[in-house]
Amino acid sequence: ASCLVGSEMCIRDRIYYGNYEFYKECITNRDRMFDCPQNLREEEMFEVPDWAANKVVYQIFPARFAASQQVDKEQWYKAPISSMDDLHGDLRGIIEHLDHVQNLGIDVLYMTPIFKSYSSHKYDIIDYYQIDPSFGTTEYLRELVQEAHKRGMKIVMDAVFNHTGREFFAFEDIMEKGEKSKYLDWYYIEKFPLESERGEIPNYKCFGYYGGMPKLNLKNPEVEKFFTDVACYWIKECDIDGWR
């Protein structure tokens, strides 16, 4: 709050704008600070494929879109929803609601990550070759793509190739073997031993200062090949239409 005394402005209360909320005290934890938007580099520019031009895209967060099984209604309809809540939505639930999505005039379904992970958001992926069991199986994904295609809709999946989860095999190897790990150059490790206490800045680069999502070194040819293979695998295996 502020007041005007003569021609002078006096400030009675001061608050600080953080990443998640407002704070009364100066923010010292970088994880809570507001991040400025990053500029797009020229080498990251790409051409939009013809089929995607002028299309209406509908984003789905699978864990909270629709559940095919009986769920806890009290949990499903509660408010507010926390970032860690898992409401047990799944791929079958999406399939069962494709007619509704089609009637909305949607051309492209974009799903946030569906691969194996311990979180509800699935951005800390453990295994890029396994659908998280809570969502279903590869067969369910294949059926979802087929049913979407029957309705003239495309399926785009989330390419989480910037970082992995800590339980991803390469990072686990580093945690176990330290500087002797053959995957050392897959990440940006600053020093050993690795540390990532909650609320503290890890001693390795990661997404949003969050230690559970160590950042990949995409300049490493082995990393590039691994994730190129992942992208090609799901296109061939399930006929998905693209990656975001």
Residue ranges and their predicted role:
Residues L109, D241-W243:
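Hydrophobic residues within beta-strands of alpha/beta enzymes
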Residues R14-M45:
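Short beta-strand elements
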Residues A1-G6, C10-D13:
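Single conserved hydrophobic/aromatic residue that forms the stacking wall/gate
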Residues S2-C3, D50, H121, Y209:
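Generic structural signal for beta-strand residues in well-ordered domains
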Residues M33-R64:
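Compositionally biased low-complexity segments at domain edges in trafficked proteins
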Residues K55-V57, F61-D107, I114-C238:
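Substrate-binding/active-site clefts of carbohydrate-active enzymes
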